Amino acid sequence: MSNVPNELKYSKEHEWLRKEADGTYTVGITEHAQELLGDMVFVDLPDVGTTVNAGDDCAVAESVKAASDIYAPVSGEIVAVNDALSDSPELVNSEPYGQGWIFKIKASDEAEVAALLDASAYEALLEDE
């Protein structure tokens, strides 16, 4: 089974969310998602300053197998993107919960964060797939 860190929140679309000390949230795709996609060749990042709604497609992960939309797990403003992915998209594969993060968002509604899946609920979702 894929690694599912307890401290993160998860979406049903296989994005993860981690609260940072400054109150923003870092977003990436889960180990499960990157395993399904295979080796990353390109990540199309959102523009900093863009306002998104929960569920909006805001980035694209392109792998040797497919291109897959990455969805905003919560509504808010994109405040940073992982520029390292431009030169090293494989970080999404090698460090999905670390250096392979996709973007940071300032959430506009904390209730959306609370409504995301915890690690045990996400693990149950994976077992049902």
Swiss-Prot record:
The keyword Cell cycle does not apply. Its cofactor is (R)-lipoate. GO terms for cellular component: cytosol; glycine cleavage complex. Disulfide bonds: none annotated. The glycine cleavage system catalyzes the degradation of glycine. The H protein shuttles the methylamine group of glycine from the P protein to the T protein. Belongs to the GcvH family. This is Glycine cleavage system H protein. It comes from Cronobacter sakazakii (strain ATCC BAA-894) (Enterobacter sakazakii). The gene is gcvH.
